[in-house]
């Protein structure tokens, strides 16, 4: 700046002062206050009100849902279920527009291929974990018995530590120890636990020391495509329907077709559909 005294010229620097000062101190062994000699007129970016961040996120998600032709019924269900966990947990993660854009960009890639097979509430929460807590995201996939009701599916139950039919108290003690262990080094560990409780009632049972079995039945979780149901769980991570499964989208469309069909044709069409699925070894 001093050796280039050009007229009508302004030198504009965009930088993170904390990062620069830390670099001076650790790498150059220079006092962090040396930055003041270089930049005489710092102008920090003004902070943005949280309500504008919330609105920006809401608008971007709504735009994505419109592009994906998400039904009005599903959006209304989300608007009923999502605000509580957003206000108490999620909005604390989104303090900058950069974080919102990163999250929505990820969501724009992961949701489209599986949009009809997942619960929107659960998928939006899981996407936060995938973006900001990748270690936890990988642990959910690698250790599903610490999150799911493993007894609902023998494929998850037999490899689990609970195959010896432990008492619930002992089982939840193991789950709590596991969750505490993997979250302890995370920056926002308590907020993260709040998200996990919002997704997996077994985690809530373990951390809060109460049981929600009556609230979350196997039938309800399957109908609502909740991540905590073993038949839905894989879809959230594979972003596709397993080759051995019939997609929910196909089942729903087929049932709607049968419902609208004339009674005289219904039996033949149903038989034909079942035969085709059997030929593909899916049914």
Regions found by a protein language model. Give the residues of each.
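Sensor-1/coupling segment of RecA-like P-loop NTPase cores
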Residues: 4-28
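Intrinsically disordered, low-complexity boundary segments flanking structured domains
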Residues: 25-33, 219-224
